[in-house]
Amino acid sequence: ERREGRPISPDRGPEILAKTKKNAQGKDMLDNGNEIIKTANHFVIINGDKPEKALMAMKSTQLKVSRGWNSLMQDQFETDPKTSKALPAPMFSRVYKLQSVENSGSFTWHGYKVSLAKKVDNASLYQMAKEFHNSLKQSNATATTEESNY
């Protein structure tokens, strides 16, 4: 197989990871020598002059940041005005600030720092985020029912 540094196939999840073994550097390798890179994807809206939808792929040292971000999102609650009970807030109902930070160990690299900025306070931005969320949910449901090309 060619080693061009690009994905060979879109295999995902525990099925492909179950076929790997850790090499001396701790990387997940298949028997054929291909590396499987664990990647966490976050669909986001970049809140600039004109909001833009984007995909943030986090791998390697940023997987810990991704897990922390997921925990931060899961720790957000809203109070139901009728019952006064705390309910999980939709992930798209918050604005998060992402900063670039320098990390160091045996070498130096830059990564992300994620913090909660505020609740979404712009109705059109909230609606855009909600529609984006719903379209992704629908796409995921469709993708799981289709048969693979591989």
PLM regions: where:
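Low-complexity, intrinsically disordered regions enriched in charged/polar residues
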Residues: 10-11, 23, 59, 63-67, ...
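Extended serine/threonine-enriched, polar tracts that run as long, contiguous segments within proteins
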Residues: 38-117
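Glycine- and charge-rich intrinsically disordered segments
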Residues: 123-150
